[in-house]
Amino acid sequence: MKVCIYGAGAIGGWIGSGLAHAGCSVSVVARGATLDALQLHGLRLRQENQVTSQAVASSDTPADLGVQDLVVLAVKAPSLPDVARQIAPLLGPQTIVLTAMNGVPWWFLQGFGGALAGTRLTSVDPEGTLAEALPVQRIVGGVVHASCSVDEPGQVCHHFGNKLILGEPSGEKTGRVQQLAALLEKSGFEVAVSEQIQKDIWYKLWGNMTVNPISALTGATTDLIMNDELVRGFISRVMLEAKDIGARIGIPIDQQPEDRHQITRKLGAFKTSMLQDVEAGKALELDALVAAVRE
C-alpha cells in the first residue's frame, strides 16, 4: 500500500514509522531541516532507548510523490490552508485521508445527524477551501491517544500510549475503515473502530481545550496545572459548559470533569503540544481547540 504522511511531526512520524516497518511504501511531505534529515537518515523513531530508521521517499512538493492509497494528515490546524492548496496530486479516486489531528476538524458536522448537521464551521474553514479540497467522502476520522515528541528534525520519540481510534464521519463500519484498522493493527498499533468518531474527538478535546491553552499561557506542565485548586476549578467549569454543548449537538459525555482530571494527572510533568508549540515559536491551534467550541 502506498501511504503518504503529510506532516512529519511527532504523531505523523510515529504513525509513518509503524506503517513503514509493516511493509507499506511510505512517503513524507516535509520541508526545511526535517526534509533534509529524512533524505539523509530516513524516518527515525526512538522508543525504549532504541532508535530505528525506515527508508522513506520525501519531498516538499506533493506532486513528486504521486497518487497514494492513504494519506495520513498529521499537521497542525494552522497549516491546513496550505495543505488544501497542495494536496491534490496525492489524491486518486479511491484515496483515503486519515485525519490524525487535535481539535475540531472542518468535516466535524458533515457526517452525522443532530441539530447542526451539515453546518460548516467558519472558525476552522472560513472560506470552505478545506471542504472543497478534502470533502467528507474522502475522510476517515482519527483520534490519537499517545504521547510523542520530536527529538530533532526527522526523529521522533514515542513515550507512552499506543491507541488509535478510527471512524467514518457517518458512523458506518465500512469495508475501507475495517481494512484500515487491520493495516494499522498489523503495524503495531492498538486500534478501535468507533460508531461515532465525533464523540471520541469531542472527548479528547474536552481536556485539550482547557489544559492546552492554560499551559501555553503559563508555561506550566500538566502536573502543576492539576495541583492548583483554583485553576483546576476553572477548568472544571469550562468543561461543564463544553459538556452541555456536546449534549445539545448529539455527542454527550457520560463522565464528569474530575474523571478526566484523573487521566490528566497520570501524564505527570508533561508539556502539552500547545506549550511545545509556544516554546518552538509556532502558530497555535486556538481555532480548532477553542474557537470552534465557542462557535
Locate the predicted segments by residue.
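Helix-loop-beta segment of a Rossmann-like dinucleotide-binding subdomain
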Residues: 58, 91, 105-117, 156-168, ...
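Rossmann-like NAD(P)(H) cofactor-binding subdomain of soluble oxidoreductases
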Residues: 52-55, 60-151
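Flavin (primarily FAD) cofactor-binding/catalytic cores of flavoenzymes
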Residues: 21, 30, 84-85, 176
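Internal alpha-helical scaffold of NAD(P)-dependent oxidoreductase catalytic cores
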Residues: 37, 90, 131-204, 210, ...
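Short internal beta-strands
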Residues: 28-30, 166, 294
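NAD(P)-dependent Rossmann-like dehydrogenase/reductase catalytic/cofactor-binding core
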Residues: 224, 236-295
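NAD(P)+-binding Rossmann beta1-loop-alpha1 motif at the extreme N-terminus of oxidoreductases
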Residues: 1-50
